[in-house]
């Protein structure tokens, strides 16, 4: 019988309702929330990351939010160390860690450690090959440079095999190949992981929600938030914080590369692509219980499930 303590992981694509559900669960069960989000770690990235607001944070605190400046490239390895520290602190308080977010690589290294690069989806591989046949591998290399400049710098523009593999990693996981380079020393944590996946059954529901949420962000002064970052003078578009979906597109708008409508269109499209990559990874997740974002009795379903397995 497994005597290791529980960790509950609430995963899902962007805009699926994870934060609301997590706060509701933390008010009903002895949970303390740890954010598993590669963008929420940054101070000043609030509106565009859908970070919990002050009222929500007063109701239920979230660990690993607002812990570093956008000028600092926060890594998966640093997350592993920070998360382990927070998990131990919560254990001492006789509470259960509730890990919530959509950065799948972070969940992966906590639960499974890191031994090898993930395998690519055959559909993703075929798509890349078709694009290369149409535009050439040099063009694909240019695109790789935009999303993973470190890997692109190490790969010859004519090395089709390595370009394809680097692009497969990004398309499948949403993380650049270079982010995996320092992870081989990390081992899976000795806990019982309870994996909950929150996602809508209807893809159009998620697409509409993503569009509405981004438009609401714009109404909530998202442009001004990015402008403050832009005007600092010490940040640039190659930093992970500024490459975050939404921020990247508004940055290009502020620099004159996009007009307003193009910025909006590109941001919504990029967010939908992010959700698609997250779902691709989640469908392969072992031992996970799926819940439908659209269910009206979602909270009671999840609470009943957790109580049913002994929590």
From Swiss-Prot:
Stretches for region Interaction with substrate tRNA: 37-40, 161-165
Gene3D superfamilies in alphabetical order: 1.10.20.140, P-loop containing nucleotide triphosphate hydrolases (3.40.50.300)
Residues that bind ATP: 12-19
Residue positions binding substrate: 14-19
Catalytic activities: adenosine(37) in tRNA + dimethylallyl diphosphate = N(6)-dimethylallyladenosine(37) in tRNA + diphosphate
Cofactors that this protein relies on: Mg(2+)
EC number: 2.5.1.75
Pfam families to which the protein is assigned, alphabetical: IPPT (PF01715)
Name recorded for this polypeptide: tRNA dimethylallyltransferase
Family: Belongs to the IPP transferase family.
Source taxon at top rank: Bacteria
Transmembrane parts of this sequence: none
InterPro entries in alphabetical order: Dimethylallyltransferase, IPT, P-loop_NTPase
Upper classification of the organism: Bacteria, Pseudomonadati, Pseudomonadota, Gammaproteobacteria, Legionellales
The protein's role, per its UniProt record: Catalyzes the transfer of a dimethylallyl group onto the adenine at position 37 in tRNAs that read codons beginning with uridine, leading to the formation of N6-(dimethylallyl)adenosine (i(6)A).
Quaternary state and interactors: Monomer.
Signal sequence, start to end: none
GO biological process assignments: tRNA modification
Site positions (Interaction with substrate tRNA): 103, 125
GO MF, any single term: ATP binding
Keywords for the protein's UniProt record, in alphabetical order: ATP-binding, Magnesium, Nucleotide-binding, Transferase, tRNA processing
């Amino acid at each position: 019988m497994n005597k290791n303590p529980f960790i509950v992981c609430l995963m899902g694509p962007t805009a699926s309702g994870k934060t609301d559900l997590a706060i509701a669960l933390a008010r009903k069960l002895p949970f303390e929330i740890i954010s598993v989000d590669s963008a929420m770690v940054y101070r000043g990235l609030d509106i565009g990351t859908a970070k919990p607001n002050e009222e929500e944070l007063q109701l239920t605190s979230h660990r690993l939010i607002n812990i570093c400046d956008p000028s600092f490239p926060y890594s998966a390895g640093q997350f592993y160390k920070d998360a382990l520290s927070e998990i131990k602190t919560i254990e001492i308080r006789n509470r259960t860690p509730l890990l919530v977010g959509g950065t799948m690589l972070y969940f992966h290294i906590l639960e499974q450690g890191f031994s090898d690069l993930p395998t690519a989806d055959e559909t993703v591989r075929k798509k890349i090959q078709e694009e290369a046949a149409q535009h050439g591998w040099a063009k694909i290399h240019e695109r790789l440079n935009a999303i993973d400049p470190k890997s692109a710098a190490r790969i010859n523009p004519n090395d089709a095999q390595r370009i394809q593999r680097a692009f497969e990693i990004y398309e499948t996981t949403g993380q650049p190949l270079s982010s995996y380079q320092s992870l081989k020393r990390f081992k899976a944590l000795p806990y019982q992981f309870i994996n909950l996946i929150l996602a809508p059954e209807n893809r159009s529901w998620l697409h509409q929600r993503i569009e509405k949420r981004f438009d609401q962000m714009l109404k909530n002064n998202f442009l001004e938030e990015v402008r403050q970052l832009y005007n600092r003078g010490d940040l640039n578009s190659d930093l992970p914080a500024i490459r975050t979906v939404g921020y990247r597109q508004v940055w290009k708008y502020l620099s004159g590369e996009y007009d307003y409508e193009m910025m909006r269109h590109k941001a919504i499209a990029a967010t939908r692509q992010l959700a698609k990559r997250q779902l691709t990874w989640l469908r392969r997740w072992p031992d996970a219980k799926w819940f439908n974002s659209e269910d009206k009795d979602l909270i009671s379903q999840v609470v009943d499930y957790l109580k049913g397995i002994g929590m």
